[in-house]
């Protein structure tokens, strides 16, 4: 159950309270609690393991020797300079499928992978083409057209192609939402939907691929035994009724032998399978070209392919050569071989079949050609029962009373019952294979570009081929020939082969090798898919299949794949196996669409697909179409497949899938109450799911009204109604005395939140002092997994003129608290200049100054802001700083590549900072800062005098900066500092504070600035000048916020550094990461 711990002070502290709820306060004279030698938690940077970016356990004393970036030098051990990091960020390497996930292996050495090299055409388009075009096109498409007619066949193909196109659009969005490591479709589904759905759908996809192998092998054997070498059959039918059983037994024997041979080939030399892939693809392309060439030829020279009809019944052209009952030979009439098949003798008086006697024998052309007008006859469907005669529509026939169908007669009969939904199930496997390109994602040069382009082009190409073939088959081939599945009326030839030109053998041999190659590809891909699932460890009993040979080949997975494939071969019927794999592929495609729809509707910050032509409605339509096709194909198969997936899902959930992949289903947990809170309780969210859950620290005035209402406006623009927002504030006092004021303050805050249309929670704390109250909020706001990870506060504008000289300590300690809590910190400077929600920026830039890498928040925040209509038209520009030794040209290329992988559109500029000498102005500014600090520490002035001295030094500071920017050379450092107090007053102060020593104030006039402070001031001045030069007119500037000093003695100097760093800018957002990665290039 959710637990909260709050650190509270053990001893009473003499800390007072300032006027700001977000500022730390301390009474004058209170002892410094921090030992410089022993920094407390919150100093510097957090130390936490992955996914936190800081993993360095050894302090590096002199990491950075230069002067330009001295302001950030205490953080260099955890937040490296961008210039040193860009090359690693841009030039990523894909991880091979099955290795430990990149998000779980961030601290270990990456496995070296060969650089990808394939482009869109070779890597995606051709593999998809090869996998989509296959056995159904050559063996069943003509039969589907004959049974369903051109119109319904067109509808079947259009539905299936629409389903795959919608799925490809969803898959393209997922594939372009980050780097897709090798692992392809399984990786995309599992990382988008979580381990439960990922495991269930992954296994369904594996089973579909395995049964596809069985279907291809059965297709190979059917081509071999039916069209290449019928005499090779082992089992021979003694009667006509036994032919079907004999064929099935032959398929089982030859199929098992072919499977064993292919499994050995895959086990011994998978590289040869890959090398032969182009050969198999060439066979497919040549076969299709031969079909189109044959269609063109029929327009002017149709082939002479006679088909014999008895009445309106089609006759199988076997055991007779003349389509006639009698023929004239030597001026005499004799019976033909056809007569002897229907009669019990060759004489004219022999007893014959009644239908044979009553009806005439006619001969028609099987392929009359495009211009024959047969298209209209084939327009409508002709469904039939099993064992029905294949009859020609429109031909007269004399019915007979004998309805029995005696065996041995050479009729062409239907082998199975045909109807629309059954044909959908048989046809759908012919459009699968759209994920062949994504499965090769690890071998592509640019997967984000190649996968959408290649896959969609392949679907368009194959859809055109299928749809055109349906129309052309209906226009060229006689209906009875189309419905003749095995070409019995054509002397056992392949129907589509008889249409092809120049020879039927082009189709026969081409289809044989293409189906053989497709079977090898399935037996190659399925074991690797199972190996990836096993190595993920989400299904414990499958983990043994994650092991293999020394080179990583999945030996055990191949063995299981062969056994499952054998069950499909024992079914022995291609028409029975096709609906099974249709179920598994449809379920896989359905969840791809679901993944895209969920991610789009959740609008997680990591959902930034580079492919823009998607919409959740398209994904939902694709998901609905997949589900509908599952039940159209076979409702009982659909229920069985869903039952298998459901059992796997519950098993993974029961065993506890302790995998965190940053999936969309986890994001839904935040919208459910108790159950969801318990689910998101375990550990921090994955980098892909990270979004700013903001705690807004508000300041209240004496009337309990919000001082900076635009801070809430900015929060609503940043959040856009998504995620968690907690608005917090602190009242000083005891709850018994302040509960009325607390209620009034909470009502004021809620009304302001309502006015800003901001959805969130209000949490107000009454504490004895503001310092502890703010610390309580940072520690304990939220519940369980609904806790903030980011603190947003306004910059204390009046930190120099506050009533309490130590009011700035409240701010610095807040920075330390957020760092210790591993929370990000956003500080809005000049918050009253920020836009309200009603304002619109019609132009302008959001400038990001990326100095050090502290998790990537600087990249994520502008992206989130630009989702809001206030900032939508602003352009994003990213600046980074190059030192003398850096290659700025290469840095720019690397940064552009990194942003490309992040799917963020932004202009990139690398600014070179020359390491020049420290200017006199910087030296003077540092001296003034230290003099002010020493004065406030060593002299206990009255309130008015202290304000007067602080203001004087601030005015001289500002004036000297104005002179320095107006002239090329800054004025020299003054010899002394003018004071407004008298000598007598000074002596009285000294006698009153003898414990402070008499030498401290004398040293004030001869003070030399500390070299470390000079270098830090130099950094602040130089960066400020560079930022002003580039971004003075920007609508918003985002800057890395340097961490507070590890020694608390320099806190007041830290405030001065930040003031100088941001001087002259209108709207500034200082960003300090929480010590963990918040943005990733991965999907």
Swiss-Prot record:
Residues 143-149, 226-249, 301-419, 474-504 are extracellular. Chloride 1 binds at residues 433-434, 589. The modification Phosphoserine is found at residues 30, 33, 50, 62. Its main location: membrane. Glycans are attached at residues 312, 331, 360. Residues 12-27 have a biased composition (Basic and acidic residues). Keywords: Cell membrane, Chloride, Glycoprotein, Ion transport, Membrane, Metal-binding, Phosphoprotein, Potassium, Potassium transport, Symport, Transmembrane, Transmembrane helix, Transport. Residues 664-680 are annotated as: Scissor helix. One of its GO terms (biological process) is potassium ion transmembrane transport. The keyword Protein biosynthesis does not apply. Widely expressed with highest levels in kidney, liver and pancreas. Expressed in choroid plexus and suprachiasmatic nucleus. Mediates electroneutral potassium-chloride cotransport when activated by cell swelling. May mediate K(+) uptake into Deiters' cells in the cochlea and contribute to K(+) recycling in the inner ear. Important for the survival of cochlear outer and inner hair cells and the maintenance of the organ of Corti. May be required for basolateral Cl(-) extrusion in the kidney and contribute to renal acidification. Belongs to the SLC12A transporter family. K/Cl co-transporter subfamily. Homodimer; adopts a domain-swap conformation at the scissor helices connecting the transmembrane domain and C-terminal domain. Heterodimer with K-Cl cotransporter SLC12A5. This is Solute carrier family 12 member 7. It comes from Rattus norvegicus (Rat).
